Amino acid sequence: MPAQIKKYKAAAVQAEPGWFDLELSVKKTIHWINEAGKAGCKLVAFPEVWIPGYPYWAWKVNYQQSLPMLKAYRENSLASDSDEMRRIREAARENAIYVSLGYSEIDFATLYISQVLISPTGEVLNHRRKIKPTHVEKLVYGDGAGDTFKSVVQTDIGRVGQLNCWENMNPFLKAMNVSEGEQVHIAGWPIYPHEETRTPLDPWTNTSNPNSDIVSPAYAIETATYVLAPFQRISKEGVDKCTPPGVEREDHNLYNGNSRIFGPDGQCLAKADEEFEGLMFVEIDLDQSHLPKALGDFGGHYMRPDLIRLLVDTRRKELITEADQDGGIGTYNTQDRVGLNRPLDAPKVDGPSGVSKQVLLSNAKKAAHKG
């Protein structure tokens, strides 16, 4: 179904997360959702594991130094079926806005690099997990499964997709997304050091510069999508929180100013300064993708499925299975199991949400648009 709204305002968040502090992280999330709502945005995009911040310290410390930080990080990760997540969903509903949220999800005793796309009525339209954590991230997070890696969702503002970090350079994930007609893409990025910090053996790709200025626009060019590419930022105080005793403090400025927004032909439409903290805006016009798609639609006329095809397996592989009533193998949907399909309570119009009563009353009357 074609998008009902083709022209609208969207925002990408470049801000400092609430390091090791779930409650602070949630308050910051709701603040930026409210700010995007006040600005008239239909969509707001947060960075990778915005809650409770990216564990960049895992790249800097040894095993013993990491243990107290890892414990605190796990204690402040976000459970999907929690009051904290419901507050975020309610903020999306109060502002009648789509929210792409990156968070460290704790499910039983495993963490995942997760994203949700929340609708303007607070429903979770997409729940996905990074399919393979990168290098030392494997010491913190587990892998996504078959039913948690697809991302493109039809909405009334277009077909919206989301990926985390180096997933945005994964040719197979890009092929899958473009084949589903993606129009707006959220490339969630963590906090990343500038190339000046690179040591001789460290690949250049492991710095912010190529990811901000090559990977993200390449995604836009190859898929002819708008790409919102939010990064986290960090302050001197944040560096102190993320650095254990005995480890040299780094200059926080070497990690900031990496957020970008690109148009469907790869042009940079918005670029953040190092000291900028706030929302980057873009005026999206879905019709701007017509000519880039006319020249090269890799999910349509510019591909040869008779020669090259991608096999996608969206089945969840169970650790323990049980027979169902028909004698087959029982299964479940992860999004349902973790409580993200649980409906919210009725909208409130008299609470201290930060949104005016008039706006709350108006937004509460709006119908869901799942597409």
Swiss-Prot record:
GO terms for molecular function: cyanide hydratase activity; nitrilase activity. Residues 8-286 form the CN hydrolase domain. Residues 326-356 are annotated as: Disordered. Its EC number is 4.2.1.66. The keyword Nucleotide-binding does not apply. The keyword Hydrolase applies. Transmembrane segments: none annotated. It catalyses: formamide = hydrogen cyanide + H2O. Keywords: Hydrolase, Lyase. Induction: By cyanide. It comes from Botryotinia fuckeliana (strain T4). InterPro entries: C-N_Hydrolase (IPR003010), C-N_Hydrolase_sf (IPR036526), CN_hydrolase (IPR037544), Nitrilase/CN_hydratase_CS (IPR000132), Nitrilases_CHs (IPR044149). The active site is at E48, K130, C165. Oligomer of dimers, forming left-handed helical fibers. Belongs to the carbon-nitrogen hydrolase superfamily. Nitrilase family. Pfam families: CN_hydrolase. It is an enzyme of class 4 (lyase). This is Cyanide hydratase. Catalyzes the hydration of cyanide to formamide. Degradation of cyanide may be important for plant pathogenic fungi in infection of cyanogenic plants. Can also transform some nitriles like 2-cyanopyridine and fumaronitrile and has a minor activity with 4-cyanophenyl acetonitrile (4-CPA). GO terms for biological process: cyanide catabolic process.
